[in-house]
Curated annotation (Swiss-Prot):
The gene is mt:CoI. It is a multi-pass membrane protein. Keywords: Calcium, Copper, Electron transport, Heme, Iron, Magnesium, Membrane, Metal-binding, Mitochondrion, Mitochondrion inner membrane, Respiratory chain, Translocase, Transmembrane, Transmembrane helix, Transport. This is Cytochrome c oxidase subunit 1. It is an enzyme of class 7 (translocase). GO terms for cellular component: mitochondrial inner membrane; respiratory chain complex IV. O2 binds at residue 242. Cu cation binds at residues 238, 288-289.
Length: 511
């Protein structure tokens, strides 16, 4: 108990993040099953659109702030960054502990916000005037805002910690251009967090004072403008989606490189520049979420072009992964299956993103299920596939145990079918004009919604199967004697699992 509560050890804190993320992931998945159950058939199942939108909002917040970010940045980041840098721990170990312990209260506040009054049925964007005092009276939205504040503080502290660690604690010989790609992905992610989260904090604080202290930042009656909120929110919100995927890029680079039996990823310097370019461009495209609010045609033209340019560094990454795989004799291990699934399905999600980047097309597709399909392809089949690949790949290092490979392959096939069956039909629904954030729909949309709901049930079985596989591994205790991998990066030189204090003597990278 004391060891976990007051931990200053990056491995223990990383493990806490994994457990927290897995728990939040189960809550978020349960909410998504409620959504698909409601939409599995025309007519009402759970209730009215308010409760439906409370579920949708909580699903988004939990999956983003309490599942993907804690697992990718808190779990994999904490575990792997010090090991890959040859550093004994993070730069600020106690702040690291605080970053974690801010999250359970944040999640609690979010869950409480759903339980008081009518809940926050605003969508994760929390746009006023729907989120303002009149349309959403009561404490729900205020509690959700405080939840976001805590999660944001946690992420900012974590970001400062990672940036400082990478600048100051690289081992001798690990220059920036020789630093592993996963470490690069985490430090770029940290920079994005550091620059974008304060803007979100400002926006939701202004919303808080509009609701409670009679200001009118977003109220036209007092000279405010609700569009200002949208600009502030999306200036955070767009970098945020790259924050969610960049650590995944880093993990996929390591996994593909290692499973290909190559010594390094193809074009690793180009991969670094591509991630930097994605991070920079991510800050200057935010208004592509706002093509329907009545911006000037020249503004729309700029945001269309800038958004499409992001496809270039992303394409560099995709083709470099393919080049890394080129000419290899692949053994289809579970980790490489997830990585290959990532590359393929992330590309599909990226292509629908390029479609939506066209402002004139987006005016038709905005707020339809086409957008839902797009971002779930890059999240549910990008971020989640990367998490699955990374977890399976580094599980023997983290625990010193092995998973059942045959079951993992079956589980991959189950999940692959499930997520595609869930989200591919949503492209058709969107093109046919089915709008987002409604609990009911005209009969014409029934067929594809039934298919989608069946897919979500298959995905749920896949998730449960995965938890069973982990349980089986933990109770069977099949110890790893030595890693079967070539040491493609230095974390594999550790024991399995690593000693509590690794690198008590610092390593040296020679030429």
């Amino acid at each position: 108990p004391r060891q976990w509560l007051f931990s200053t050890n990056h491995k223990d804190i990383g493990t806490l993040y994994f457990i927290f993320g897995a728990w939040a992931g189960m809550v978020g998945t349960s909410l998504s099953i409620l959504i698909r159950a409601e939409l599995g058939h025309p007519g009402a199942l759970i209730g009215d659109d308010q409760i439906y939108n409370v579920i949708v909002t909580a699903h988004a917040f939990i999956m983003i702030f309490f599942m993907v970010m804690p697992i990718m940045i808190g779990g994999f980041g904490n575990w792997l960054v010090p090991l890959m840098l040859g550093a004994p721990d993070m730069a600020f170990p106690r702040m690291n502990n605080m970053s974690f312990w801010l999250l359970p209260p944040a999640l609690s506040l979010l869950l409480v916000s759903s339980m008081v009054e009518n809940g926050a049925g605003t969508g994760w964007t929390v746009y006023p005037p729907l989120s303002a005092g009149i349309a959403h009276g009561g404490a729900s939205v205020d509690l959700a805002i405080f939840s976001l504040h805590l999660a944001g503080i946690s992420s900012i502290l974590g970001a400062v910690n990672f940036i400082t660690t990478v600048i100051n604690m690289r081992s001798t010989g690990i220059s920036l251009d020789r630093m592993p790609l996963f470490v690069w992905s985490v430090v770029i992610t940290a920079l994005l967090l550091l620059l974008s989260l304060p803007v979100l904090a400002g926006a939701i604080t202004m919303l808080l004072t509009d609701r409670n202290l009679n200001t009118s930042f977003f109220d036209p009656a007092g000279g405010g403008d609700p569009i200002l909120y949208q600009h502030l929110f999306w200036f955070f919100g767009h970098p945020e989606v790259y924050i969610l995927i960049l650590p995944g890029f880093g993990m996929i680079s390591h996994i593909i490189s290692q499973e290909s039996g190559k010594k390094e990823t193809f074009g690793s310097l180009g991969m670094i520049y591509a991630m930097l370019a994605i991070g920079l461009l991510g800050f200057i495209v935010w208004a592509h979420h706002m093509f329907t609010v009545g911006m000037d045609v020249d503004t729309r033209a700029y945001f269309t072009s800038a958004t499409m340019i992001i496809a270039v560094p992303t394409g560099i990454k995709i083709f470099s992964w393919l080049a890394t795989l080129h000419g290899t004799q692949l053994s289809y291990s579970p980790a490489i299956l997830w990585a290959l699934g990532f590359v393929f399905l992330f590309t599909v999600g990226g292509l629908t993103g390029v479609v939506l980047a066209n402002s004139s097309v987006d005016i038709i597709l905005h707020d339809t299920y086409y957008v839902v399909a797009h971002f779930h392809y890059v999240l549910s089949m990008g971020a989640v596939f990367a998490i699955m690949a990374g977890f399976i790949h580094w599980y023997p290092l983290f625990t010193g145990l092995t998973l059942n490979n045959k079951w993992l392959k079956s589980q991959f096939i189950t999940m692959f079918i499930g997520v595609n069956l869930t989200f591919f039909p949503q492209h058709f629904l969107g093109l046919a004009g089915m709008p987002r954030r409604y609990s009911d729909y005209p009969d014409a949309y029934t067929t594809w919604n039934i298919v989608s709901t069946i897919g979500s049930t298959i995905s749920l079985l896949g998730i449960l199967f995965f938890f069973f596989i982990i349980w089986e591994s933990l109770v069977s205790q099949r110890q790893v004697i030595y890693p079967i991998q070539l040491n493609s990066s230095i974390e594999w030189y550790q024991n399995t699992p690593p000693a509590e204090h690794s690198y008590s003597e610092l390593p040296l990278l020679t030429n």
